[in-house]
Amino acid sequence: MKYLFLLFLLICSCASKQHATVIDSTQVNASPCPEDGDCTFEVLSNQSFSIEKDGIGALYPKVVDGNTIILKFEYKRNDIPNTVDGQYRELVYLELNRDHLEIDLKEDELNNVKALFARLCFCRGQTGYYIINQGQLSIKKLSESQYHLKMRFKIDEVPQVISEIDEVISFK
């Protein structure tokens, strides 16, 4: 019984991280992440995505096996206590050609990497996926396998929390 109580205390004492976590690569620099949530950064190798439309014309990404690299940044706000449907997430997807990782793009050139933003919440009329065509994206080579990604962007269609991504990543 004493061990169950200690286990309960251990589980209850866990706290959320306040910085970005990089999955499938090495984290060196964390993007600014709001204190009220967690941020993750994923490198999806040998994957590709297309931007599809559903039956009502809303956009969504369709991820399939491919020969490109998908970068996925996610901000997930901590759930608000005592609320139903209080979840809130923002995602940014980028697709990179593995043979041409160094890039410097702005505005409509962001279409070259299929820059896609998602706001997922119970926010009537203000949720969904949106093409990013305002901003700048720079990926510079630091070493043989390490790159610095810096992105600033703006979405006019919906409010956004995340407007900047700054990561140093290693491709395996």
PLM regions and their residue ranges:
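An ectodomain-focused feature that recognizes extracytoplasmic/extracellular
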Residues: 17-125
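C-terminal motif of bacterial Sec signal peptides marking the signal peptidase cleavage site
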Residues: 11-13
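Generic "edge-of-domain/loop-turn" microfeature
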Residues: 78-80, 99-101, 144-146, 156-158, ...
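Acidic, glycine-rich flexible loop segments
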Residues: 108-166
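A structural detector for beta-sheet-dominated domains
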Residues: 44, 72-76, 95-97, 106, ...
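A short, surface-exposed beta-strand/turn
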Residues: 90-101, 159-172
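Sec-dependent signal peptide recognition
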Residues: 1-7
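Sterically constrained small-residue positions within well-ordered secondary structures
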Residues: 5, 62, 85, 128-130, ...
